[in-house]
A protein has these predicted regions:
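Membrane-anchoring alpha-helices and their flanking helix-loop junctions
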Residues: 1-132, 160-215
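Active-site-proximal inter-transmembrane loops
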Residues: 128-153
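PRPP/pyrophosphate-binding module of the type I phosphoribosyltransferase fold
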Residues: 155-157
Length: 215
């Protein structure tokens, strides 16, 4: 419940910043792509209430990586406000509703990819870099292709949000998520390698870290 309350509180604050950036609710409903974006946001929020992710330190945690959460928080608040604001004032925007629709599609696809692993892992999915009780290495399904699908979904989701508001600032903000995500992945994989030893090494040898075929 604590995790759900935090998600809800952050969601409310982010929604408020987006509305503030757009100058009210009316401008959002004047653009069909943004109306579709609002529907997708609502669907993803509802879906998140059925997840079992947590913020537990579990049996062992790398507390030195908690700074990444603070960076994510600041970046996400900027993502909530700046793309909407630059869209409203026409600063560094990309012309055309087609880019908005592309953004909506990417936002939805990224959101699904972000949330899918949370459902797969259940209570083993933590917002912290930690080993949970009964932790097991999942190597099938989407994890048989890439080791960090949720983070790839996070990047795609954030990029889609920026494009839905035609915002180049939003695109840059999405790119700024990559360094802390890579730092987070390295910390997580170091812990998994310590926990599962040769099993994780064999798994990492046959899969990509984040982007199939590239990285």
């Amino acid at each position: 419940m604590q995790t759900l309350a935090l998600i809800a509180a952050f969601g409310v604050v982010s929604l408020g910043l987006t509305i503030l950036g757009m100058g009210g609710v009316a401008p959002i409903f004047s653009h069909p792509p943004l109306m579709a974006l609002a529907v997708v946001v609502c669907l993803l929020l509802v879906a998140s209430t059925f997840t079992s992710g947590n913020l537990s330190s579990g049996e062992r945690e790398d507390r030195g990586n908690r700074w990444v959460l603070a960076v994510f928080g600041v970046l996400q608040l900027m993502v909530a406000y700046l793309p909407a604001y630059t869209d409203r004032i026409g600063f560094w925007t990309i012309d055309g509703d087609s880019i908005r629709w592309l953004g909506v599609v990417l936002f939805a696809a990224g959101g699904v990819l972000r949330m899918w692993p949370v459902f797969v892992l259940g209570r083993r999915f933590s917002g912290l870099v930690a080993i949970q009780p009964g932790h097991a290495l999942v190597t099938d399904g989407i994890y048989g292709i890439i080791r960090n699908p949720s983070y790839l979904g996070f990047i795609i989701n954030t990029l889609g949000w920026g494009l839905a508001f035609r915002s180049m600032v939003g695109v840059i903000l999405a790119a700024l998520h990559i360094p802390p995500i890579v730092a987070r992945i390295r910390a997580e994989e170091a812990m998994l390698r310590m926990q599962f030893d040769g099993e994780f090494d064999r798994y990492s040898d046959r899969t990509y870290r984040l982007i199939p075929g590239l990285y």
